[in-house]
Every structure is written in C-alpha cells, then in structure tokens.
Amino acid sequence: GTCLDSIEDFKQLIGDFPVDRGFYNLAFEGVASQVLFAMYIAAAEELGFSRSKLRGSAGADPIGSRLGFKVEVFPVEAELKLSADVLEFCVKNMPRWSAVGVGGFNCRGGGIDAVDEVGISLAAAIAYIEGGLERGLHVDECAPAISFFMASGIDFLEEVAKLRAARRMWARTL
C-alpha cells in the first residue's frame, strides 16, 4: 500500500501519470475511500486535469466493508448517505467515474460462497442506487456509476457460471 495523508501526497503519486487517459482503481475501504477520493480529485485538478475526464473507481462500498472486513466507522445510515453523496457527485460531475465499487470479493474473503456473494453484491448495489433515486437521480444515471469487484475461486466453472448469472440478474433488476 501507499501512505497518502494529504493532497500533496497524491500530487507526488500521480504527478507523472496521464490520469485523464487511464482507468484508476482507488482501492480504499470504508469511509476513508470517500475522503481519499476527494483528495485525488483535488490533486488531479491542481495538476491541470479536468475532473470530468477522469476515469476510475473509488471503492466506497460500506456494505462490503462491514460484511467482509468488519469495518464499522459510522452508523450504516451515515455511511450509505456518504456513498449517495459520492454517487450524486459523480453522476453530475464525473460521468466516466465509477462512484461505488461493490466489493463482492470482500464478503467472499469473509467465508461466504459464490451464491451468497452474488446476492449480497446485488443487494448492496440496489441499496446504492436507491440512495441515488432518493436524490432525484434516474436509475439510468446511477447504474453506470456502479461497478462490481467479484472474487474468483478455484472452481473455474462455478465462477464462470456465477459471473454469467450475476450479469443476467443485474440486467433484469435494472
């Protein structure tokens, strides 16, 4: 990992990279992901990059963090509100950014099976979209701002079937 405590740290980290031409996964967990995401945006803008052209994912999955890593910083309602804040901000200002990276792999690491991983991931994604809908956003605006990070175990055929089923279930849900 990398220790990032300030906007200056981010500027030093990304200073030589064309951050507007790649996809950057900011793999931070819990509430820290939103704070570090804001620092990343500020650093990129100070380096002359437009936030609307940045592409990547910010993690920001408090449900996955709670279930997979047992990280509970604030009450769940406050964490869901913060995730909805990030989702709304990204929909309005950063259309190429995945506001919430639903971490099914976090839960899988906690001991659940592939079926439960899909169920928990879809339920979490629905909760995040509902947060956007409560703010007046449309599902077609929210859905592209949600990404999924799923585990891949040793049973190859089961994992392929899981991913195919998850895609179909997500499409039907939307």
Predicted features, each with a name:
Residues 163-167:
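Active-site loop/helix belt of alpha/beta enzymes
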Residues 1-158:
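Catalytic alpha/beta active-site cores
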